[in-house]
């Protein structure tokens, strides 16, 4: 019996920025399937812009933000939407992963703690910054750990950024700070989302 995947859910894109004609775009996607993951090539398009294609993925039973930071545009991007140039579902093999939930828990034991949002004053102006401590509680080393940082005011997304941490060793704890040069509204919550494809052969 071939099971049809539950379609990916996608929220409408957010657009932030405008300082020096640079904009940040992002959209949240969610995969409700328990035994299927997807890889894809995506881009953002609109009435007056189109970004370059980028490869991405989403694991089973997960949600994440797809981001495009620093888009150069003389005018604010209009009618933005997330589109896929290619998209493939992959079923998780019971033979290869007899207990995928356990496999995921063991491999993605990356947690962010002591998350704070604040401001730093410089001669060039004030910077917004997020600080956090990333702990790799797994038995695995990671050459790179891409991380998405999502800022909220209540339930509303008000900004995002990314950082990639290099050479995170098993059981390592690392303090990290990420800055924003542009102004931001009051932030009440910060999500730190490590983004590692543990199913990429």
Question: What residues fall within each predicted segment?
Answer:
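Short solvent-exposed loop/turn micro-motifs enriched in small/polar/acidic residues
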Residues: 8, 49, 142-143
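N-terminal "mature head" segments of proteins
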Residues: 1-25
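Surface-exposed interaction/gating patches
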Residues: 19-36, 100-158
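Beta-strand signatures of extracellular beta-sandwich domains
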Residues: 41-45, 146-150, 193
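A cross-kingdom feature marking solvent-exposed beta-strand/loop segments within repeated
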Residues: 14-15, 22-30, 37-39, 45-75, ...
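Terminal connector regions
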Residues: 1, 55-58, 69-118, 158-162, ...
């Amino acid at each position: 019996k071939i099971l049809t995947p539950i379609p990916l859910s996608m929220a409408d894109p957010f657009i932030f920025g405008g300082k020096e004609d640079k904009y940040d775009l992002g959209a949240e996607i969610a995969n409700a399937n328990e035994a299927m993951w997807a890889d894809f090539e995506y881009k953002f398009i609109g009435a007056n812009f189109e970004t370059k294609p980028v490869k991405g993925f989403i694991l089973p039973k997960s949600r994440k933000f797809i981001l495009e930071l620093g888009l150069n545009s003389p005018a604010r991007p209009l009618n933005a939407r997330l589109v896929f140039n290619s998209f493939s579902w992959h079923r998780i093999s019971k033979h290869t992963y007899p207990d995928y939930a356990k496999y995921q828990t063991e491999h993605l034991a990356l947690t962010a703690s002591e998350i704070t949002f604040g401001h730093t004053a410089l001669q060039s102006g004030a910077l917004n910054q997020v600080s956090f401590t990333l702990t790799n509680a797994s038995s695995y080393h990671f050459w790179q750990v891409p991380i998405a940082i999502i800022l909220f005011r209540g339930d509303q997304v008000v900004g995002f950024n990314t950082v990639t941490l290099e050479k995170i060793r098993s059981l390592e704890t690392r303090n990290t700070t990420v800055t924003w040069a542009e102004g931001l509204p009051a932030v009440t919550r910060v999500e730190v989302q490590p983004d590692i494809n543990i199913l990429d052969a």
